[in-house]
Amino acid sequence: MISFVQLVVQIREIFQQKLIDVDEVMKLMASYKSNANEWRRFAIFDMNKYTRNLVDVGNGKYNLMILCWGPGMASSVHDHTDAHCFVKILDGELTETKYAWPRKRHVPLDISENKTYGMNGVSYMNDELGLHRMENLSHSNGAVSLHLYIPPYSTCNAFDERTGKKTQCTVTFYSKYGKKVDYRGSKNGN
């Protein structure tokens, strides 16, 4: 069994290679058994929205972050702007709903898969598989998830589930390395 620090180090080692094996990354993410004492300092909640908390920038090759989900919180339906997305549940449960890419304008998105992941569950998503939304369906418990994005990205597209309408969004970090970010006066949110 590996620690959270060892997981971060081993992810960094994988990304020193020229070719990245998705299955190897999935196995590594699955090999870590969540221990809140190891990652708690990065898990910063906000009662009004889910938060993206940066853990490691991986020499510009990836972003590793912890997302914190209050009861009932959800992401928008979104793409990953050609990035690979690995998710590991560190605490609680998250439901992932996958959607097919919109084929027509002003038509509801088609759900292709709906799956709930409990603690230590691992998921993978990329744009070839479609769009997705992550949500904490619990009305009383929070959830925490570890996300690895390869390559890192600063924008994505959000989609209206009812119409398929696409809107470009800038993604920001609520905290970096365990410290809340103050964006007052910042134009890019990074």
From Swiss-Prot:
GO molecular function, a single term: ferrous iron binding
Keyword Aminoacyl-tRNA synthetase: no
Catalytic activity: L-cysteine + O2 = 3-sulfino-L-alanine + H(+)
The entry's keywords: Dioxygenase, Iron, Metal-binding, Oxidoreductase, Thioether bond
Pathway connected to this protein: Organosulfur biosynthesis; taurine biosynthesis; hypotaurine from L-cysteine: step 1/2
InterPro entries linked: CDO_1, RmlC-like_jellyroll, RmlC_Cupin_sf
Single biological process term from Gene Ontology: L-cysteine catabolic process
Pfam families the UniProt entry points to: CDO_I
Coiled coil (UniProt feature): none
Covalent cross-link site, 3'-(S-cysteinyl)-tyrosine (Cys-Tyr): 85-149
This enzyme's EC code(s): 1.13.11.20
PTM notes: The thioether cross-link between Cys-85 and Tyr-149 plays a structural role through stabilizing the Fe(2+) ion, and prevents the production of highly damaging free hydroxyl radicals by holding the oxygen radical via hydroxyl hydrogen.
CDD domains registered for this protein in UniProt: cupin_CDO
Top-rank EC class of the record's enzyme: oxidoreductase
Cofactor names: Fe cation
Binding residues annotated for Fe cation, in chain numbering: 78, 80, 132
Details of cofactor binding: Binds 1 Fe cation per subunit.
Family, per entry: Belongs to the cysteine dioxygenase family.
Name by which UniProt lists this protein: Cysteine dioxygenase 1
Gene: cdo-1
